[in-house]
Amino acid sequence: MTTAVLDRRHLLAAGGLIMVAKASGLLLPARAEGFAPTESMAGGSNNYRKGAAIMDRIGKGGFWMSGTVRRAGNGAPLAGQRIQIWAHTVEGQEQEPQSHGATLTDENGAFRLEMPQIIPIFGQPHGHLAYDSGEFKTVFLRPVMRSAKETSLEAHFVLQPA
């Protein structure tokens, strides 16, 4: 039978080992590195039309779609990325070409595009956004508004290389 010896020398040695392990990060819980990539949302690609034109505004405007685009892992802002936006609005249904447009992110990875007021379809006022330029994996989003009276909606992308 083995007997454990817990004298002062053994306790100090064990305490020292624990302190070294803790300082080196060996006792920290596992964590995700940085920013996890955005997954496509169900219904995000509904009525998608490849190649919507880059524009300053869709239709007569009055509603703002905005957000950011970052790199998975380190969260660095991604400038010059094309984001396509479409929705069911007061000026047209989401499958109609005039309801689609695209914009580019600025140097901070931010985008903003004015469009007509989004109105409910199938009970939920929502927008559609897509990153589909090829350098990173394609992502489709379908954010839902809390109320049809809101005049803006945000969506954020974290992209991973294709």
Task: Identify the function of each model-found stretch.
Residues 30-162:
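Beta-strand-dominated extracellular/periplasmic modules and repeats
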Residues 15-18, 22-28, 131, 139:
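Domain-scale detector for complete catalytic domains at protein termini or as standalone homologs
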Residues 1-22:
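N-terminal secretory signal peptides and thylakoid transit peptides that target proteins
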